[in-house]
Regions:
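TPR/TPR-like alpha-solenoid signature
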Residues: 10-12, 31, 51, 91, ...
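Residue register of alpha-helical TPR repeats
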Residues: 48, 88, 108, 128, ...
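Structural signature of alpha-solenoid helical repeat junctions
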Residues: 45, 65, 85, 125, ...
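Short coil/turn linkers that connect adjacent helices within long alpha-helical scaffolds
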Residues: 20, 38-42, 59, 76-82, ...
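Single-residue signature of alpha-solenoid repeat helices
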Residues: 26, 66, 106, 146, ...
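C-terminal non-catalytic interaction modules
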Residues: 1-25, 32, 280-371
Length: 371
């Protein structure tokens, strides 16, 4: 039995906010309470309200404001000597770094957050930090390094009946199964995540899980309409809650469904829209994936092969710079499918992986970390 989803990142005077609170409401109330805490001279309360402000800005795609807010939250927490609040602020900064495509910085910050949380005896912050490190490695494609950590965090979340992190872990493991071709396992886990999220009233987690189910139905070659219907259901949630990043990824996935169904003109339109959304929030991973879909769609619509080849080379270099190994493999696959051979120096560069090493914190035993 799972409890209702909670939002431990909303703390202090904002503790009554829920996981489904609109981001505009979180930002407005967080800003108001931050001013009140500043008037009262409470640095720890300023740090906790600042955390909510930082997270609202980040989830709305306002990355510069989010960057300023998490750093201010950290400074206030440090001034108050509140190590746990310092951990939460750095966790927010690490999550923002991952969103912006700086995976090395994300690893460093999330590792620091985990250490601070341990020092401050904040087991929830430590759990979130370890989960963030696991997600960063998964997004990068380093499944061997983070697969066990995902499984351990899932087991802990199930044991406690903690819905939000059960959903997160299920979706992460499902994505790894999906990317390694184990579609049946992935589909079962995405569907379980969707059901748990629905029952726990975790609307954000539900929207992401529906997107995962739609992806599997589409990639297996099923009728595209059920996948499109699921994406429409998820989109309604994203729009109602103003989940900017989730909405952009929803649109990119709709492009994927159209592309796999051979509906290249519709796919192009969705990829172009998603590309603009990701650029507007400075999210390079989503931007790169949308660019890849757009290049492939245009190629099928008759674009000049030389231009396609040039675009894929540039995209591959960008993905290599960011360190997104799985996405880079997708470019290699596109080059083969479209008859565009990679240059010799590209193949040679594969011998030198450019992804950051997993910090020691990610290999630590997480038992009890999210209790």
């Amino acid at each position: 039995m799972y409890s209702k989803a909670s939002a431990p990142e909303y703390q202090g005077a904002l503790g009554s906010l829920s996981v489904n609170s609109s981001l505009e409401d979180v930002l407005a109330r967080g800003t108001e309470q931050l001013r009140a805490a500043r008037r009262e001279g409470s640095r720890e309360e300023m740090a906790r309200c600042g955390l909510a402000v930082a997270e609202a800005h980040r989830r709305l795609g306002q990355v510069e404001e989010a960057d300023q807010a998490w750093k201010a939250s950290y400074r206030d927490a440090r001034a108050a000597g509140a190590t746990g609040a310092m951990a939460w602020a750095v966790w927010s900064g690490g999550t923002l770094a991952r969103q912006r495509g700086d995976l090395r910085l994300a690893f460093r910050l999330l590792g620091l957050a985990a250490r601070l949380a341990k020092e401050g005896d904040d087991v929830v912050a430590r759990g979130y930090s370890l989960a963030g490190m696991a997600e960063t490695g998964r997004i990068q494609g380093d499944y061997q390094a983070v697969g066990e950590l995902h499984e351990q965090l899932l087991a802990e979340a199930r044991k406690r009946g903690e819905a939000r992190h059960t959903v997160w872990a299920l979706e992460g493991i499902a994505q790894m199964h999906r990317n390694t071709g184990e579609y049946d396992k992935a589909l079962a886990m995405f569907r379980e995540a969707a059901q748990i999220a629905r029952d726990a009233d975790d609307r954000r987690g539900h929207a992401w899980a529906l997107r995962g189910v739609a992806d599997i139905l589409s990639v297996r070659g099923d009728d595209p309409q059920p996948a499109l219907d699921l994406l429409s259901e998820a989109e309604a949630i994203c729009r109602e809650m103003n989940l900017t990043s989730a909405l952009a990824y929803n649109h990119k996935m709709r492009g994927n469904v159209f592309f796999r169904a051979g509906r290249y003109e519709e796919a192009r339109g969705m990829y172009e829209g998603a590309l603009g959304q990701f650029r507007g929030m400075s999210e390079p991973r989503g931007e790169a994936l949308s660019r890849l879909g757009l290049v492939k769609s245009l190629a099928h619509l008759g674009r000049d092969p030389e231009q396609t080849a040039a675009d894929l080379r540039a995209l591959r270099a960008e993905l290599d710079r960011i360190g997104l190994r799985h996405a880079r493999d997708m470019v290699d696959k596109a080059q083969a499918e479209l008859g565009v051979e990679p240059r010799a120096q590209e193949a040679a560069s594969d011998a030198k992986p450019k992804h950051p090493e997993m910090p020691a914190e990610a290999h630590a035993e997480p038992v009890g970390a999210m209790r």
